């Protein structure tokens, strides 16, 4: 055991108590660092075919009352007929049994996949996409199956109480996962509604809670949306979902590691591991629900200098 811990000093031999690489350590009950005892190969107690495939990610844990193992693979060679897979196994009394085979979940050759659970659901994040794995997909004869679906990014309400001429009050932060943002207006009988400077298009329009199919047109140069029939006056009764030119989605998909935190409820998901000194974390939607589909742009923590990438996060206690 190392006592006391002198910290991490990468690229140097260091003094006693300092670690040159933050790998293969675990924390004891006394808060000390100790080396892990090592690993040994075990024969898998179930059929698992990896011919032509490379394992890109593994996860084991509980979903509901069941214990599962998830394995992500992608082809060792070119991506073609031999695509990527996620295989899910359920533990039974006699051992693990196949629960699902999810072919081409990312639709591209992955370099890595990290699995994590958040609010009782299983997610798979990779350099090629972000998936939520849930019941209802391909299944075996006697075992409930699973399906992998792309995580639908939460669209934040960034401005509320705006007049058709603009203004309003800032509410939610933009979501790194998407270039979509919402703004609500209090109609005054006008037909023309000015959008923020970042708007390059309009994706959806609601009036008094009803979604309308192309009720007007958007002029990208003036950033004005014009209704063919002006909405009736009201308070926050017009909502326009607009598009920004870009998003920070690639930053999220570059995070290889995760940790959950926030007391007993674990309402925050922290992502890190893109080679920077920054970790980002999820937020809470307007309705008050924690969401793995919402990473507010300002929810980040920078540690030390830019030349000191984060190599590990640990939830300690609680």
Region annotations inferred by a language model:
Residues 1-98, 147-178, 251-318:
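N-terminal beta-propeller domains
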Residues 59-62, 88-89, 111-116, 130-132, ...:
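Short, exposed beta-strand/loop patches in secreted or surface proteins that constitute
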Residues 86-88, 130, 202-207:
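Short polybasic amphipathic segments
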Residues 95-108:
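WD40-like beta-propeller blades
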Residues 105-120, 226-228, 248:
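Beta-sandwich interaction modules
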Residues 110-158:
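Hydrophobic or amphipathic alpha-helical targeting/insertion segments
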Residues 141-221, 227, 231, 243-256:
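Extended beta-strand solenoid/passenger and fiber regions
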Residues 236-244:
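Short, hydrophobic/aromatic-enriched beta-strand segments in well-ordered soluble domains
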